């Protein structure tokens, strides 16, 4: 959370339910978004992800990831989407996708990938989530349950007008696709890598590496890859079967790995937290510049961005958002908070004020 930047609300989209054909399976399925709405929501979320998380400032590395991602997407089941690939400035070990073809890696995951084939495996996996419409189905499920995902727009004025819709923005960090979807994304990632010229074993290798990373090793402000992509160790064996199937269909020997080239690209990569935005250590959030610390309950997932810090309870039923806002009219804090909640369609049951180091 950067104290000099204030949060803006995020406009949500009104979506109507209907049936659509899955581009990968050809099956008819109920989803809340048409493809046009999916792309529009993705673009909206992309703006918020970039604003709240920020992109990692290395143009050459960004272009490198984008080139590989676009090569994979061009050979996927949905090449016509407006695909975008970017590295966000977070030390967490994660990768995630937004509906419509917007894919993100954190800078924190980059050192844990061994070579270019691993990178293609991660990107291909996330592309698979989009092509098989896992992202859309996850939004549909969350919308049906009226879950307010932890995002910058949790108090958005639009919420009362489009109540029951899933918020975009950083809510993508908490989307779970389920075991079957993860297995399908693994298979698609390996297939996309192979037909694009990369060794599909990179999917297996990156799963093997990430499965050895403990849950607590990479959170640091954003849920890590293992918490949103479960059963990695079991999936390693299943990817082996996928590789055998690919080998029966095409020659996958000698495909691109490029270990040294990948490692050269990482030279100078920043590792760790940015103390100016505060740091997350376990369940503690610490901000040296503002001189305060906050301890969350056990099991809560914490998100720290340039504009806010928030946490969600296991089960996603209770949320907390700590946010710095401008108050040029010097209104009473409780009135300011209640007004924001009311505009968002929320009712205050109980509230009060507290001060921490003069804040």
Question: Where is each model-derived feature located?
Answer:
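Bacterial N-terminal signal peptides that target proteins for export
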Residues: 1-10
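A Zn2+-metalloprotease active-site environment signal
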Residues: 8, 19-297, 301-317, 323-359
């Amino acid at each position: 959370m950067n104290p000099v930047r204030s949060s803006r609300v995020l406009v949500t989209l009104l979506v109507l339910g209907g049936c659509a054909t899955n581009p990968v399976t050809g099956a008819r399925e109920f989803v809340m978004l048409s493809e046009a709405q999916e792309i529009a929501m993705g673009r909206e979320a992309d703006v918020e992800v970039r604003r709240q998380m920020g992109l990692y400032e290395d143009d050459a590395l960004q272009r490198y990831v984008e080139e590989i991602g676009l090569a994979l997407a061009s050979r996927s089941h949905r090449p016509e989407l407006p695909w975008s690939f970017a590295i966000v400035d977070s030390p967490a070990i994660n990768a995630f996708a937004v509906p419509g073809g917007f894919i993100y890696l954190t800078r924190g995951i980059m050192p844990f990938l061994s070579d270019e084939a691993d990178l293609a495996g991660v990107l291909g996996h996330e592309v698979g989530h989009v092509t098989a419409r896992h992202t859309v189905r996850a939004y549909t499920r969350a919308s049906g349950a009226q879950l307010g995902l932890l995002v910058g727009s949790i108090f958005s004025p639009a919420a009362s007008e489009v109540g029951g819709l899933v918020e975009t923005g950083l809510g993508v960090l908490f989307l779970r696709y389920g075991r079957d979807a993860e297995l399908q994304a693994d298979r698609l990632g390996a297939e996309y890598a192979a037909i694009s010229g990369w060794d599909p074993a990179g999917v297996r290798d990156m799963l093997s590496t990430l499965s050895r990373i403990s849950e607590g090793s990479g959170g640091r402000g954003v849920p890590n890859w293992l918490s949103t992509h479960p059963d990695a160790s079991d999936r390693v064996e299943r990817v082996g079967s996928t590789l055998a199937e690919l080998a029966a269909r095409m020659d996958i020997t000698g495909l691109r790995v490029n270990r040294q080239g990948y490692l050269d690209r990482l030279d100078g990569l920043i590792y760790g937290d940015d103390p100016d935005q505060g740091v997350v250590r376990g369940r503690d959030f610490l901000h040296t510049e503002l001189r305060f610390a906050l301890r969350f309950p056990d099991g809560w997932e914490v998100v720290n961005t340039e504009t806010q810090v928030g946490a969600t309870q296991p089960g996603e039923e209770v949320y907390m958002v700590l946010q710095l806002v401008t108050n040029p009219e010097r209104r009473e804090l409780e009135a300011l908070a209640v007004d924001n909640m009311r505009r968002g369609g929320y009712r205050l049951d109980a509230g009060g004020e507290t001060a921490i180091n003069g804040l």
